[in-house]
Amino acid sequence: MSHLALQPGFDFQQAGKEVLEIEREGLAELDQYINQHFTLACEKMFNCTGKVVVMGMGKSGHIGRKMAATFASTGTSSFFVHPGEAAHGDLGMVTPQDVVIAISNSGESSEIAALIPVLKRLHVPLICITGRPESSMARAADVHLCVKVPKEACPLGLAPTSSTTATLVMGDALAVALLKARGFTAEDFALSHPGGALGRKLLLRVSDIMHTGDEIPHVNKHATLRDALLEITRKNLGMTVICDESMKIDGIFTDGDLRRVFDMGGDMRQLGIAEVMTPGGIRVRPGILAVDALNLMQSRHITSVLVADGDQLLGVLHMHDLLRAGVV
């Protein structure tokens, strides 16, 4: 490959915009292929009791991997199998309960063609996505989804560009149509993304991160202010609960309450905690989502909340706990 000097006046931005325009035209053509064949493909995938197995070679394989990943994260159980590996044993992963999606822009992939007779013998439903309705794969398919584009964005017409974009979008169309048909929710999405921010917000509950047992700062209502301050210092949560031996809540005392005590003046050594506590305290139940507790704390401008069942203290949640858990 020759490495020539950059042509004088070459416009990178214009070249990029031309690609966008060509690919935009390709996607506009795709609209006509969302038809009865698309409906049939969706129905086969929706009614599949096994998994949706995606196959493709080369660039089609890269698109297929992304397609399978999108299906799997949006409620359609799916995985990718390389056609070459399938021909050497991995086809054993495919069962008659599955649906196979085979991708090839030309529709003449020899690796996939070698698998079709076996898939037919196993009675595995076959959906082929190609850019040529007259291709051998299109003719062999139970359902053919056409992704034909006017031309590739590559000026040589060689590098898959517009065609791979169209295939990717067709996969997204299938995934989202099925998502809507299944009534797939954000909570369902979070179950397959527990490590992400959305997963933490939609799965993590107060009971998962609250302080319990000896970690809870607490004194009884007969304690002095000094006793309460010592407990706050020991437990390092900036507050203490006032409760009886059975952990029935009487109130709460926070660093904000302490500032108000200073404003009162007088001899603080003589004060009982019952005189300066906030009765009751703001409470949440342990089963609520941590993000809901966060919203409550932010709306009430507080840094900690009691976790309780009625008047029975179960735990304490601090803003720092939410920060550590990645909810904030």
From Swiss-Prot:
<dbReference type="GO" id="GO:0046872">
    <property type="term" value="F:metal ion binding"/>
</dbReference>
<feature type="binding site">
    <location>
        <position position="88"/>
    </location>
    <ligand>
        <name>substrate</name>
    </ligand>
</feature>
<keyword id="KW-0129">CBS domain</keyword>
<dbReference type="InterPro" id="IPR035474">
    <property type="entry name" value="SIS_Kpsf"/>
</dbReference>
<keyword id="KW-0413">Isomerase</keyword>
<feature type="domain" description="CBS 1">
    <location>
        <begin position="210"/>
        <end position="268"/>
    </location>
</feature>
<comment type="similarity">
    <text>Belongs to the SIS family. GutQ/KpsF subfamily.</text>
</comment>
<keyword id="KW-0448">Lipopolysaccharide biosynthesis</keyword>
<feature type="binding site">
    <location>
        <begin position="114"/>
        <end position="123"/>
    </location>
    <ligand>
        <name>substrate</name>
    </ligand>
</feature>
<dbReference type="InterPro" id="IPR046342">
    <property type="entry name" value="CBS_dom_sf"/>
</dbReference>
<dbReference type="Pfam" id="PF00571">
    <property type="entry name" value="CBS"/>
</dbReference>
<keyword id="KW-0677">Repeat</keyword>
<feature type="site" description="Catalytically relevant">
    <location>
        <position position="152"/>
    </location>
</feature>
<feature type="site" description="Catalytically relevant">
    <location>
        <position position="59"/>
    </location>
</feature>
<keyword id="KW-0862">Zinc</keyword>
<keyword id="KW-0479">Metal-binding</keyword>
<feature type="binding site">
    <location>
        <begin position="148"/>
        <end position="150"/>
    </location>
    <ligand>
        <name>substrate</name>
    </ligand>
</feature>
<dbReference type="Pfam" id="PF01380">
    <property type="entry name" value="SIS"/>
</dbReference>
<comment type="subunit">
    <text>Homotetramer.</text>
</comment>
<feature type="binding site">
    <location>
        <position position="82"/>
    </location>
    <ligand>
        <name>substrate</name>
    </ligand>
</feature>
<dbReference type="GO" id="GO:0097367">
    <property type="term" value="F:carbohydrate derivative binding"/>
</dbReference>
<feature type="binding site">
    <location>
        <position position="82"/>
    </location>
    <ligand>
        <name>Zn(2+)</name>
    </ligand>
</feature>
<feature type="domain" description="SIS">
    <location>
        <begin position="41"/>
        <end position="184"/>
    </location>
</feature>
<keyword id="KW-0119">Carbohydrate metabolism</keyword>
<feature type="binding site">
    <location>
        <begin position="75"/>
        <end position="76"/>
    </location>
    <ligand>
        <name>substrate</name>
    </ligand>
</feature>
<dbReference type="InterPro" id="IPR000644">
    <property type="entry name" value="CBS_dom"/>
</dbReference>
<dbReference type="GO" id="GO:0019146">
    <property type="term" value="F:arabinose-5-phosphate isomerase activity"/>
</dbReference>
<dbReference type="InterPro" id="IPR050986">
    <property type="entry name" value="GutQ/KpsF_isomerases"/>
</dbReference>
<feature type="binding site">
    <location>
        <position position="275"/>
    </location>
    <ligand>
        <name>substrate</name>
    </ligand>
</feature>
<feature type="domain" description="CBS 2">
    <location>
        <begin position="277"/>
        <end position="328"/>
    </location>
</feature>
<dbReference type="InterPro" id="IPR046348">
    <property type="entry name" value="SIS_dom_sf"/>
</dbReference>
<dbReference type="InterPro" id="IPR001347">
    <property type="entry name" value="SIS_dom"/>
</dbReference>
<comment type="function">
    <text>Involved in the biosynthesis of 3-deoxy-D-manno-octulosonate (KDO), a unique 8-carbon sugar component of lipopolysaccharides (LPSs). Catalyzes the reversible aldol-ketol isomerization between D-ribulose 5-phosphate (Ru5P) and D-arabinose 5-phosphate (A5P).</text>
</comment>
<protein>
    <recommendedName>
        <fullName>Arabinose 5-phosphate isomerase KdsD</fullName>
        <ecNumber>5.3.1.13</ecNumber>
    </recommendedName>
</protein>
<comment type="pathway">
    <text>Carbohydrate biosynthesis; 3-deoxy-D-manno-octulosonate biosynthesis; 3-deoxy-D-manno-octulosonate from D-ribulose 5-phosphate: step 1/3.</text>
</comment>
<feature type="site" description="Catalytically relevant">
    <location>
        <position position="193"/>
    </location>
</feature>
<dbReference type="GO" id="GO:0009103">
    <property type="term" value="P:lipopolysaccharide biosynthetic process"/>
</dbReference>
<dbReference type="InterPro" id="IPR004800">
    <property type="entry name" value="KdsD/KpsF-type"/>
</dbReference>
<feature type="site" description="Catalytically relevant">
    <location>
        <position position="111"/>
    </location>
</feature>
<comment type="pathway">
    <text>Bacterial outer membrane biogenesis; lipopolysaccharide biosynthesis.</text>
</comment>
